[in-house]
Amino acid sequence: MDRRLCKEIEIESLCYSSLSRKTAEISQDVLMEIFTQLSRKVSKERPSSKTTSLQLVDSTTIPLNKTRFPWATFRKTKAGIKLHLNLCYLDRDTQYPERFTITNAEEHDRNHFECLVDKTESTYVVDRGYFDYKLLDRLHNDGHFFVTRTKSNTTITVLEQIEPTHRKTTDGQIISDQHVILGGGNNHVTERFRLVTVLTKGQRLLRIVTNRFDVSSTEIADMYQTRWQIELFFKHLKQNLTIKQLYSRSEQGAINQVILTLIATLLTYLIKIELNSTATLFQLKRSFHYLRFELAEVWLERYRPG
């Protein structure tokens, strides 16, 4: 542990075993309440709506050593935990974790999707791993909007062809815009949905299904394109925050550290809002590390606008 840090906070030493023990002892209920309150505060500072935000839902597996974390085993030779996350996306510089759950890595994403969905009139952008006829019907009937991809073997019945007003998208061009029924026989949706087919610049064909009929086909394509922002968030979380190395080998300790990492992300984002800074969360976090022993004025001067 950094000796200067110990001196600044007036302790003689801080060893790995102490961090391990303390991380495991923290009440998970307390951490969840802190996360919830911070998320609400961010939401008040940067309110979201149907027209201004998207809810990006996905999961990431945090691999663990099977010998050190036997409770996290999910395959014969593998261990890990899975973070299921709802990331509120307003724009490229404005996104923050809003809801999450943590499970063993073997848990299927679909089983925990409902835990992350709580806003009517919101648009949930998800990958095709969540694609399910009953789920799409339920989301629609419960007042939620969605944007996702169909599976390659999805049966599609075209009801109506719509002529796109514009064909160029951020990552390709619109091939078709249709009103459709998905599925067939005894396995199908009960509602009419919209299917936008896109040919990407990499020559991939994406079939995007949604219940948003109020926006253009290019907007639908661009909505799905934002899904990659949650992948970048996961990458940032793993590489630049504190879940590269878990201090505790216990299940509660490991999960607590992931929650603490999400709390740190929200705190960093609140600082970004307070400063009206254009810096990324990673840039702010890095400055915390390099300027942690400097006066607050030094840090503020660096990130004060203008």
Task: Mark where each language-model region is.
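DNA-recognition alpha helix
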Residues: M1-I11
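Alpha-helical solenoid repeats of the armadillo/HEAT superfamily
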Residues: V42-R46
